[in-house]
A protein has these predicted regions:
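Loop/turn-to-beta-strand initiation segments
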Residues: 6-10, 253, 328-331
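Signature of the SF2 helicase/ATPase Hel1-core->accessory helical subdomain module
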Residues: 1-49, 339, 346-364, 368-378, ...
Length: 521
């Protein structure tokens, strides 16, 4: 930020508000460090208003944003740009008896009143992540169970509280852990101190030994399950999706999203054993697997001495993998690292192997493909555990209330803006999983949440959120209402002038491709 302090700046983003108003504060501060003052005063003025909407507060925030923030929505340019549709397919599956037993055992364990394996200050967050890994695959949860047992072993031998490498291990598998941890801490009340780990008695040590035994039994059961029902259904889901793409005339390409790197590796092996050998590429935070390194080396060699190479290994690695997916691979298996910052409009099939509870994250995923430049309707495949009542209710909310999987616009800004934050919504879902034990309790809890959402997505709320999120420039639609053919001709004339000037000045220093109106220095 300091290096650009005195330079004119334009920040372009498709997702200015995701999980928190503090993201807005951060973006605005890059443009104008004095727009909102310090972060404490901003939080005091606006953060609490996010959960208790106040027309006057939102109007004030809107006025303060006007000088630095302009927004154009799809609906405002729909008559000038042909946006494609999105359509949903559901792949249902039933877990095997062994998978169901593992789920029940771990779920019951997480619902215990007292757990030693989870750091006291992170109990809620760790419980949410463990449930996400449990839903992802037996491979994802088994590694984490092993680490938790190891943490307890350390506590028993040293009688000293400690993390025991839990943070590092979970963040290596569940890549959004650090980000989620920061969001959860940010979402807590200001001034709330983290609880200290207690000192342990001999009685505690005995209970720890019993907990270690239970965790190791869970781990043993998880490792004994070599095939997952959901994984076995993946091939069927892909073929259904590819059949739909063929009908649409789209390329046979799919991106599969998972929240776990262990699950990612399991899916790679499964697909390569089922006819997709040599057609799969991985995308994750580190991108340090042998195949990715090979792709990167070949890409650098191919594009050396061109402006495609940025000099940033991280950025170039991402570009290399995306290019490989476009030109060579059929399937990309990605973690949340691919949900931001890459453009995949050449791909028309999105598979949510794991479905996040945060609707804003889902919208980000689908937005990689369902974006400007996409020529075909985007097919979105979601997996649904028919033996899990809570999973079915979550999908119902995401599909029917947030409208994430169908239509031209997907989840509208009014609807995504109606929840306090993506983090808060995740917490609400996690609480239902944690507190409800019977299908009746689950039904009641989700009905209450749905009722709240219906109230929050009322006409009054829509109007308030629209004023904040959309109408920074109320004349934008009128400004765009010009004759389309005239505007094309007008642009064409000036583009040709610019092209001819460029060729004149760079004629000796660049290779020009006239048919594509592009050049390489």
């Amino acid at each position: 930020k300091k290096s650009l302090e005195h330079a004119p700046k334009v920040l372009l983003t498709a997702t200015p508000l995701q999980n928190s108003l503090l993201e807005l504060y951060g973006l605005v501060s890059i443009i104008d460090d004095y727009a909102f003052g310090d972060i404490k005063s901003f939080k005091a003025q606006y953060s609490r208003a996010n959960s208790t909407p106040d027309e006057q507060v939102f109007q004030e925030l809107k006025e303060r944003l006007k000088p630095v923030c302009k927004r154009t929505l799809r609906r405002q340019v729909l008559e000038y740009i042909n946006y494609t549709n999105r359509m949903a397919l559901v792949e249902e599956f039933y877990p095997t008896p062994e998978e169901q037993r593992l789920y029940d055992l771990v779920s019951d364990y997480l619902q215990r009143g007292n757990l030693y394996a989870l750091p006291t200050s992170q109990r809620q967050l760790m419980t949410l992540i463990l449930r996400r890994l449990l839903a992802s695959s037996t491979f994802a949860i088994s590694g984490t169970l092993s680490v938790l047992a190891g943490r307890l072993d350390n506590l028993v031998s040293t009688h000293t509280p400690g993390n025991g490498g839990v943070d590092e291990t979970i963040s290596n598998d569940f890549e959004t852990y650090d980000e989620l941890k920061d969001e959860w801490e940010e979402d807590e009340e200001d001034g709330e101190e983290l609880r200290e780990e207690p000192k342990y008695t001999e009685h505690d040590i005995e209970n720890m030994r019993a907990e270690i035994s239970a965790l190791k039994e869970f781990e043993k059961l998880a490792k004994s399950i070599s095939k997952n029902s959901k994984g076995e259904k993946l091939i069927t889901a892909l073929e259904r999706g590819f059949t739909e793409l063929e009908r649409l005339g789209a390329k046979r390409k799919a991106i599969i999203f998972t929240e776990s790197t262990r699950t990612q590796e399991y899916l790679r092996k499964t697909l390569e054993e089922r006819g997709y050998a040599g057609k799969v590429v991985l995308f994750k935070g580190s991108n340090n697997d042998p195949k990715s390194r090979e792709i990167y080396r070949n890409w650098i060699e191919r594009h050396s001495d061109t402006d495609r190479v940025s000099g940033s290994k991280t950025a170039d690695m991402r570009a290399a993998i995306v290019d490989y997916f476009r030109e060579d691979a059929t399937i990309m298996i990605a973690t949340e690292a691919a949900a931001e910052g890459i453009n995949l409009q050449f791909c028309s099939l999105v598979v949510n192997y794991d479905l996040p509870w945060n609707p804003q994250r889902i919208e980000q995923r689908i937005g990689r493909c369902h974006r400007y430049g996409q020529e075909f309707d985007v097919v979105v495949v979601n997996f649904l555990n028919k033996a899990n009542a809570a999973d079915q209710k979550v999908y119902q909310l995401l599909n029917e209330k947030f409208n994430l999987f169908n239509g031209v616009f997907g989840a509208s800004d009014e609807v995504l803006g109606s929840i306090e934050s993506g983090v808060d919504f995740e917490k609400r879902i996690a609480r239902i999983y944690q507190e409800c034990r019977t299908s009746e309790q689950i039904e009641t809890a989700f009905n209450e949440l749905q009722s709240e959402l219906e109230g929050q997505i009322s006409d009054t709320m829509k109007q308030t959120r629209t004023q904040l999120l959309e109408n920074f420039d109320e004349e934008v639609h009128e400004k765009l209402r010009i004759n389309l053919e005239e505007s094309k001709a007008y642009l064409s004339k000036y583009e040709n002038w610019l092209w001819n000037i460029t060729r004149f000045y760079l004629g000796n220093d660049a290779d020009f491709a006239s048919d594509e109106h592009s050049f390489t220095l």
